[in-house]
């Protein structure tokens, strides 16, 4: 179902992404969906997930990209800062099942994007509010982070990465340990097999030599 309302994309933070996707505004007040509809895959493409992705997959993609493009990891990169902002804005929509459903149906309005948030319905709905992106800590001259005394919160990448990727890192660590143990076991078995083969061959030649000597003496 196509959207029936005009979206004020020039006022929306998500407008920049649709503009990059080649959808110019139809007027100075916004994009009217009566004439055209916005792309329903642009936000998914931005996060690098298919439109059929689960909420868990969307969340994982958001954490991964927000970590990679965080301005503190890319000082002085306007492109990274812009990508970080777009990823955060995309997750504000796709991270909410209610806003995502509206987006998929072409019903997402500017009011939805500018609102304080989706109000919970009377019936229980498993739709936790999407987490905000990691805080952006402006850097002081010289590239160093501003100190806590400046009134800003320093961003701890180690804590962020451990909080969202700790379980995955632990699984990978256990997997590497199992692979290493299996490799050593196979090497030990191969060494034992080689040692046994050498012993067997040596024994065979000794027996053959003794038989030859015994037959020689008999003759």
Curated annotation (Swiss-Prot):
Region (Disordered): 109-148
PROSITE patterns: DNAJ_2
Topological relation to the membrane, as annotated: Single-pass membrane protein
Tissue distribution: In brain, expressed in gray matter structures.
Keyword terms of this UniProt record: ATP synthesis, Chaperone, Membrane, Mitochondrion, Mitochondrion inner membrane, Transit peptide, Transmembrane, Transmembrane helix
Annotated Pro residues bias: 127-138
Protein name: DnaJ homolog subfamily C member 30, mitochondrial
Biological source species: Mus musculus (Mouse)
């Amino acid at each position: 179902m196509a959207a029936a309302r005009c979206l004020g994309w020039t006022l929306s933070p998500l407008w920049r992404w649709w503009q990059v996707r080649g959808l110019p505004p139809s007027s100075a007040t916004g994009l009217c969906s009566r004439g055209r509809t916005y792309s329903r895959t642009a936000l998914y493409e931005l996060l690098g997930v298919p439109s059929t992705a689960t909420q868990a997959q969307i969340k994982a993609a958001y954490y991964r990209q927000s970590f990679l493009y965080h301005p503190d990891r890319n000082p002085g990169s306007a492109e990274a800062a812009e990508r970080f902002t777009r990823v955060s804005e995309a997750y504000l929509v796709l991270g909410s099942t209610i806003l995502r459903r509206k987006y998929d149906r072409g019903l997402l309005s500017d009011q939805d994007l500018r609102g304080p948030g989706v109000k919970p319905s009377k019936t229980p709905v498993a739709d936790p509010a999407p987490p905000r992106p990691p805080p952006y800590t402006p850097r002081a001259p010289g590239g160093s982070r501003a100190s806590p005394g400046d009134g800003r919160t320093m961003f701890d990448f180690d804590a962020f990465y451990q909080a969202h990727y700790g379980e995955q890192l632990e699984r990978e660590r256990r997997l590497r340990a199992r692979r290493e143990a299996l490799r050593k076991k196979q090497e030990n078995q191969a060494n034992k097999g080689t040692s046994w083969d050498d012993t067997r061959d040596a024994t065979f030649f000794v027996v053959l030599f003794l038989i030859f000597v015994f037959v020689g003496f008999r003759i």
